[in-house]
Amino acid sequence: MNEFTHFNEQGRAKMVDISEKEASVRTAAAVSSVSMNREVHEKIKNREIGKGDVLAVAQVAGIMAAKQTSAIIPMCHPIALKGVDIAFCWEKKEQKSILHIQSNVKTKGSTGVEMEALTSASVCALTVYDMCKAADKGMVIGPTFLLEKTGGKNGDYKREKADVDMED
């Protein structure tokens, strides 16, 4: 297991120095989901939620969140993102509908974008909840997880089983 790098010799928090790391293309994909009742799914699909187009607003919120990750996660470096793309797909299970969210983030820099992808997917889910809570307070967010990442000295990572096919 790698040793923790966010602590100094005194055991205090520090931001890792990445000034000597080589810039390279780095990508990350993260997934989250929101489980809701079927009526809310239909309202979202038909754009009948009073606060507006839920998926459009969630998409913009997710992009904004990726760009602001370093402002809310203490040890994240500010990163010049080169792209953020968010996709949605629906799954019907028993009496529920599940909105799956995938955020794909890309940069060319000295550190990865996993936290930006995770933050983006999470904020998309939170935005859906916020916009639909009047119609269904029983919505459930999650799971949220890193699907894959490329680039960097630690190499690529791909989750073995994703349970979600975002091609739907």
Swiss-Prot record:
It is an enzyme of class 4 (lyase). The active site is at D130. Pathway: Cofactor biosynthesis; molybdopterin biosynthesis. It holds the Pfam family MoaC. It catalyses: (8S)-3',8-cyclo-7,8-dihydroguanosine 5'-triphosphate = cyclic pyranopterin phosphate + diphosphate. GO terms for molecular function: cyclic pyranopterin monophosphate synthase activity. InterPro entries: MoaC, MoaC_bact/euk, MoaC_sf, MoCo_biosynth_MoaA/MoaC, Mopterin_CF_biosynth-C_dom. Belongs to the MoaC family. Homohexamer; trimer of dimers. Catalyzes the conversion of (8S)-3',8-cyclo-7,8-dihydroguanosine 5'-triphosphate to cyclic pyranopterin monophosphate (cPMP). This is Cyclic pyranopterin monophosphate synthase. It comes from Bacillus licheniformis (strain ATCC 14580 / DSM 13 / JCM 2505 / CCUG 7422 / NBRC 12200 / NCIMB 9375 / NCTC 10341 / NRRL NRS-1264 / Gibson 46). The gene is moaC.
